[in-house]
Amino acid sequence: MATENGAVELGTQSLSTDHPPTDAAGDGSPASEKEPSLPDTEKDLGPTNTKKDPGAPDPKKNPDPPSLKKTPEAPGPEKKGDSAPASASNQGPSGEGDGGGGPAEGGTGPPAVLPQPTATADASIQKLDATQAPSGNQESGEAKAGKKAAECREAGRRGSPAFLHSPSCPAIISCSEKTLAMKPLSETTELIFAGVSETPDPQDPGPAKDEGGTNTLADGKEEAEAGQAEQAKVQGDTSQRIGFQAVPSERAEVGQALCLTAKEEDCFQILDDCPPPPAPFPHRIVELRTGNVSSEFSMNSKEALGGGKFGAVCTCTERSTGLKLAAKVIKKQTPKDKEMVLLEIEVMNQLNHRNLIQLYSAIETSHEIILFMEYIEGGELFERIVDEDYQLTEVDTMVFVRQICDGILFMHKMRVLHLDLKPENILCVNTTGHLVKIIDFGLARRYNPNEKLKVNFGTPEFLSPEVVNYDQISDKTDMWSLGVITYMLLSGLSPFLGDDDTETLNNVLSANWYFDEETFEAVSDEAKDFVSNLITKDQSARMSAEQCLAHPWLNNLAEKAKRCNRRLKSQILLKKYLMKRRWKKNFIAVSAANRFKKISSSGALMALGV
């Protein structure tokens, strides 16, 4: 051990083996016969004094003075008071050299050899000063022994730090590991290693052999730097040779995931363009039957979902299964009302598609007919997109329109025309996604291309010119309505809406519409081309549902979603449109009530016998 206690122990050993010096006449035995060689404690433990003696001989010029060579014929006065090797640097790894790196002849045992790769020039020169004492030294044996013990103690105290600077010392390696372990958490990464391979220990470069017998200051620095570089190289190489799987800690992983999620949301919103889920029940063929509604279903009339001139829609629950459904209650006022319901049931029995609402059951009572259908909780499409928390972009419109086209294509393949496509009849599957379904087949008709079909009903804003003129209709009639819906989703404006129904119908007949420059400024040319090929007076010039799905605007949604991160102005204008529509309905109701009140107060009804 390179400790102070070890140095003192070696010094004590030297005292026990030292013999009194010879007299002035030179009588004495040769050093190789009578006096055992002492271990070079100064060489092993470090320099004894840091002060440089200017009178010391130059070791480079005379590395091994003749007076220091140990020969059997050398008289006692010519050798120094304590036998020691001439130079510390003459000892190689194998103990070769003039002074001898191994134990001296007649020694008590092999002394401990401590490496000293970082000896400085001052230490080497001072070592020569301490060992090359002149032959004329007249100090007594006791004085030399005390001086030797003091030098050994001081060498032990100064030799230990020099030993710790060795790059191959376990103490310095442990110190380096502690330094790495004490680094702040911000500079290190907490890792869990799986399958770490063993790393070979760094090899000791060993003490360097100096040709001149001593190390200069520059040589000492270069040697120390080389040893430290070798140490760093070994530590650096071990990290490259280790094959491991780094797993960040839970906190770092969560933080990184949150950062990635925040960056993604800043770039674009993830759109769900998957098909909507099917109905919670398989498609079935429904027939109108009589029965007791209250025994099979629990009606919740307070939870109204909508209504119209045919009746109201509320939620209900099937008692036997607990399935939540939507119940459409239709009043039977005339025989024609029942015929319309039977036609609606016939149409819905043929529509088994994810984007089309499904029929579950139909029950007739004495005063009404109730259709039990799939419950869709998301609400109307327009009610959803006017929400302040919803960010509407052109890509959102693409996703909505594509699903509507899918539903229309299936209907047309089944020879069914909806004839009442409008925003109120497009429902969202939920309140957060982009999945929609088409509802309300009360005005739907079976279509035969070989037969003429005319209708005179619908919502004025979405009616096609052929319906207004009471001309023959076709599957292209629904495509006109799709063009109007798309126009409104992109701009928030109704292209044909007038101050009243008459003005609206006149705008439809003349196909008087245009792209508002300010509103459509951020809309792509592909979207405008899509709308222009639908809102055209000539039926044969309109795109079919299949052609719409093949249009460039409804394709490559993934690439367009990356480029489109704007919020369309239509979201703001649609809100104004809905407010105006509600105000108009309320105004009509109030006006009708006021007219009825005036007629009643004037006595006109009494004159008519009412």
UniProtKB/Swiss-Prot annotation:
Protein residues bound to ATP: L305, G306, G307, G308, K309, F310, G311, A312, V313, K328
Residues bearing PTM Phosphothreonine: T459
Keywords attached to this entry: Acetylation, ATP-binding, Calmodulin-binding, Cytoplasm, Kinase, Nucleotide-binding, Phosphoprotein, Serine/threonine-protein kinase, Transferase
Naturally occurring in which organism (per UniProt): Rattus norvegicus (Rat)
CDD domains recorded: STKc_MLCK2
Keyword Membrane among UniProt keywords: no
Residue segments, region Calmodulin-binding: 588-600
Name of this chain's protein: Myosin light chain kinase 2, skeletal/cardiac muscle
EC number: 2.7.11.18
